[in-house]
Amino acid sequence: MSQSTSAGGSQAVAQNPGAKLGFSMRSASIASDSVPCESGLCEAPPGVLSGAGTVFCESTYKVKIDNETVWQVPTRLKFVKKVGSGAYGCVASFEDTSASASEEGTEDDPSRREQSGETRTSQTGSAEGDSGTNKKVAVKKIGDLFRDLIDAKRIYREIKILKELKHENIINLVEILDPLTPDFEDIYLVSDLMDTDLHRVIYSRQPLTPEHHQYFLYQLLLGLSFLHQADIIHRDLKPSNILVNLNCDIKICDFGLARGLNMNPAPPPNLLPPATHRAGPAAAQDVVCTYTPPDNLSGAGKWGDQKLAAAAGAGSIAATRLVRLAHQQGSSLIGAQHQVPAKTDDASDDMELTDYVVTRWYRPPEILISPFCYSKPVDLWSVGCIFAELLGRRALFAGKDHFDQLRRIVRVLGRPSTAEINKVANEGRGRHFNNPSKGTSNTKRKRSEAARRFIESLPNSDPYKLEDLFPDASKAALDLLSNLLTFDPAKRITVQEALRHEYFEGLHSVEDEPTVTTPVNWSFDNFVPTKRLLQNKVYQEIISYHPEIVLRDFHLLPPRGIHVAPSSLPACIRQPLATLQQQMASLSTTARAVSRSSGSLPTVSRGAFLRTPLSGVNPPSGFFLGEDRSLSAASTAPPDEQSEGIDACGPMVRTASAPSVATSVANQLSVPGGFGAGLCSLKKESSSCGGGGGSARRPPNSGSHQVAAFSELPTAETSHSLPSAYAASLSPFPQAHAQPVSLRSNHVPFASPASQLGLSSSGGGSGGALVSAETLGASGTPAASSSPQVCSTAYSASYSAGFSASAASFASLSGVLTTSASSSAPFARKGELCRETTGQPVTTSDPLSARHTTSTSEAGAGEAVTAAPLSSRGRSELGVSPRVPVTQTAHPYIHKFLAHQRETSRRSSAIVCRATQHAAMPSASLRDRGSSGMFAETKVSLSDSRLPSVCGTVSGHSTSLPSTAAELLAAAQACGASGDGLASCHHASCSGQSCSLPSLGTVGVVSSSLLGLLPSGHPGDKDIEAGLAPDLAFFRGTSFGGRSTSCCVEGVSERSSGFLPNASLTPESSASMALVAALNSFPQTEGEARPGGPLTGHSAPARASHAASGTRCMRSGAETLGTGNGFFSAFGERAATAGPEGAGGSSAQESRTTTRSSVCTDDGAFFLGTPGESCQAQQLPGVTSASLLQQYQKELQQRQFAAHQAQTAQQQKRLQAGGIETVVVEPVQGAAASESNLVGVSRDISFNVGERTVENAMEIEESGRSEASVPQRVSYSLSEQQFLLLRQQQLQHGQQQL
């Protein structure tokens, strides 16, 4: 730090102590503090052309910090070297190439030139030897910021403090780099680059002279004085938190534990600047470092303190020097010094704070004895410990534990009197800093009493003489040290008194003591941390450094609860932002009007694609508009009942009243490559619902069901139907009564979850169809004599873009099974164009083997056709014909549970999928159930308890909610305990009609039991490979926005488990596809059916990635397999990547998949649905996926062990009786055996135990009683005790045979 002479300041030194005391190392230059722009100005980042309405989004690049770390930073930052790493993150030094450009831009402003020139000279001492004019900065990356919410809140607190505190002896937060999305996980903090810290200096071989001690301590006290004047206590002062530069400048850092003494009261009037000054750039929300002259000073004029500080930059050293210069030019400086504030015992100066502060060696006795209330003296004690460590080059009180620290303090300072001990021990008891009537806890009181008794038990010895401890120190230094290390905090010296101590004679100047004109408003710290809330708050702080990102992300901010005041933005940002908001409001109003005119529920549009760019603004190619109050952490307004419905048709309808509006919206929202066209349409008088949301829906007896032929497909332009991406975001439900049915085939290449969900595993094409159960009559009841026919439905290539974390989107899981054509998903899209066939044989195609198989319908199970994929123009490419992803009647099916958390404040959502099965049913049984009303359309209202609709779920009408895992398991068992028949959930439309929601390509779902063995093969299909029977699947993810989101998918079965960690989904991705990817990572063949087995078949990218990854992680006590980024390339660098270097540039060592993952949190609310008319969606706020999974694992092991004991006992009994070895074990659920209930059929189970390198397991070979059943080998995970007992029983069995 430099000191410049001024009139009346004779006590100031005339030379730079830093220049004289510099280390014997190369000098480093530090650029001046950045000057904030004036209101209305907006400077473009370097390399970006500025202009009215230009969106300044910097280009980034990836830089390799070390062998294991890759960062993504702006191109203006040039990597220099890695500085180090710590508990919170990694630090590296960069050169900011934009520093010289910003300095050149200050030539026209005298005040800014003054700051740039003088500050640069004073802080660097000398610029000689500097390689260039680029400013060197330190960039700190904090990865997985929200993994621990307490640590994340500390980092947020530090950001707020550093943003408002501007002082030359406090580390300067230059900026926070653009996170590129509001849903970020990592942040990059840019600060001044310092060469080392005081701890390394003390314990180095660098000689330290008394001048070094004096200069270091003086700067430390200056920075601490600024903090204490702002009523902030640091609470963690130690040498490692004091950064040192090569020219001996120091800066205090690490404000994560800092707290304000007066959190809520209004600031005193004498500290507030005039109102006319608070309106300027130095606004009231900033803490400004200024010099305050005496009141009787005249002639200040335009050189007023506030204006000088604002012109020179808040917190810069030039602010003080300009004030001095002003008084030199025309004012008589009166040498009156500031009066030292008198000590007060006011309760507002104290506060009850946590005792887990201050590193033990620097912890004052009042915290060791009475961790109730403490104040500013705690920092002065720490300064005294640091001063003693500087003098002696070792810690003075290096205690090993709590009591040893007290022992060392008493040994050096002497045992205090009983009165002093009782005073410190009783300080603050019975009062609280905000509530005087609030007392302290019994635990702290007991601890205080124990510490007091311990000190009294120590021998009463004389204190050490400081002259003996520090023989080279001066008397003034020892006197200051003695005043700092005073046992009684009330008698301890204050920071102002320390600065005026004789030890700093010749160095101290009153001008060096800046005053705080505006105290910090600590209201920002009064909140309970959650991930979404912390994300929003940190993002709002980033906006203050990069206001241009508001234009890029403005469509994502309202759903997340982020509200940016236009007045806080520069003029070049406010104007285009207002234009974008007007277009968004206009589009939302149009969607609402058209939606109401079509008879849909009144609702806020859940999403849209805006394709009309503004003049001078470059918005993203597509983004969502709308609102999602369920995930808004900051929004406290109650949800609008009128806006919580779900659009059934949305603005796709062409009505007579607003044809031009529909046409305009359709043209504006057209997506390149999309082809929203309603194929399954109904003849109505004034409207024609269509779009990618599915097929059209009609009331009973309103028209005939019409299936469009391939050549009759209209385009979006001619039918005025919006692209299906927009339709999906508004209406996830099918818009025609097209009931899917399970198909049977004699040839399916493999029985995988992809095929069960109606998806093709071919990466090159796509195909599929929704097939009606029977030819639907006017009433919606299946006709017995009609053969099944394909209901043609058009799906857009970007159909699944309309996802958001709400009930509307999660309810669409069964209807949205597509992904963008631009993504590299290994699975094909479902629901592409197909042609109507009646009475024709079923034709399937295997793209892998180029083999076609034709089969006829059996037992009325249904017929399928090959679905021809679409080109970008909506025409069929008949040359490429992938196989139809048919499902089989006896295969496991997924029972979808809705996830929504409107009534809770949870931030993520979950979809719980229940793997179920049912036996083959005759056509007559299907017709009987259809005639009984299972599939019939009925007119009901939302209040009708017989029809629990999605709308009712959103409105929170569900009752009798299970609250424990056991109740949830029981409810899941009761969900389909019959084991015979089909079920479906009904959902009501706005007009009171219902439509069966397709359950992922199957007619309905019937569960056997939660822990029942689920064979995946059909007794009549011998060629089918053994498939997977997943019992539970979890999908957790944050809000799907216009850019990307993060999610986790986990599936658990009796055979194995799969895990898709921290996947990054783009708007073109599908949540269903992610779920399929996780389930598809399970072993599929008989030889690989074990935990840890390699991925088989399906897709080359997934197979290659999983084979190279082999990553495992533990979640909820179950070992799962990381599939890496094998699903598709958009999974990003935080997924478990394949090999040493992942596709995203990151390594597997950098990836994290832990139980504390910020995305994989078990805070989603679960909805349980029961089949049939009792399909009641129930919210389970008290049940998490972790508890459900743990309960499942526990009961699974109990079931396995019970089955094994029963099998062993029967084997021994048969051996003793001379019978056969193969035994029949009844299932635990005790279901009766019948032809229609495959689950109830007894099984022949034989155990074969083998040693595993990864874990202990046993293999159970299942075979049905029928000769045509497919054997299945399943691996069961056992505990060590169970495995040893099983091994013992096996040995006993072998001995008996011998």
Swiss-Prot record:
Effect in UniProt of substituting residue 171 to T/N: Results in SB505124-resistant phenotype
Chief place where the protein resides: cytoplasm
A Pfam family of this chain: Pkinase
PROSITE patterns named among the record's database cross-references: MAPK, PROTEIN_KINASE_DOM, PROTEIN_KINASE_ST
Enzyme Commission number(s) of this protein: 2.7.11.24
CDD domains: STKc_MAPK
Binding site for ATP: 83-91, 140
Activity regulation field: Autokinase activity is inhibited by SB505124.
Keyword ATP-binding (UniProt): yes
Keyword terms, alphabetized: ATP-binding, Cell cycle, Cell division, Cytoplasm, Cytoskeleton, Glycoprotein, Kinase, Nucleotide-binding, Serine/threonine-protein kinase, Transferase
Source organism superkingdom: Eukaryota
Catalytic reactions of this protein: L-seryl-[protein] + ATP = O-phospho-L-seryl-[protein] + ADP + H(+); L-threonyl-[protein] + ATP = O-phospho-L-threonyl-[protein] + ADP + H(+)
GO function terms (MF aspect): ATP binding; MAP kinase activity
Active site residues of this protein: 236
Cited Gene3D superfamilies: Phosphorylase Kinase, domain 1, Transferase(Phosphotransferase) domain 1
Class of the enzyme per the UniProt entry, highest EC level: transferase
Domain (Protein kinase) ranges: 77-504
Location of this chain's protein in the cell: Cytoplasm, Cytoskeleton, Microtubule organizing center, Centrosome
Glycan-linked positions: 67, 296, 521, 1062
Function as written in the Swiss-Prot or TrEMBL entry: Probable serine/threonine-protein kinase. Plays a role in coordinated progression of cytokinesis. Restricts duplication of centrosome core structures to one per cycle and ensures proper formation and number of new daughter parasites.
PANTHER family: MITOGEN-ACTIVATED PROTEIN KINASE
Extra information: Mutations in the protein confer resistance to the bumped kinase inhibitor 1NM-PP1. Treatment of parasites with 1NM-PP1 causes cell cycle arrest after S phase and parasite cell enlargement. Mutations in the protein confer resistance to the SB505124 inhibitor.
Protein family: Belongs to the protein kinase superfamily. CMGC Ser/Thr protein kinase family. MAP kinase subfamily.
Protein name in UniProt: MAPK-like protein kinase
Lineage: Eukaryota, Sar, Alveolata, Apicomplexa, Conoidasida
Originating gene: MAPKL1
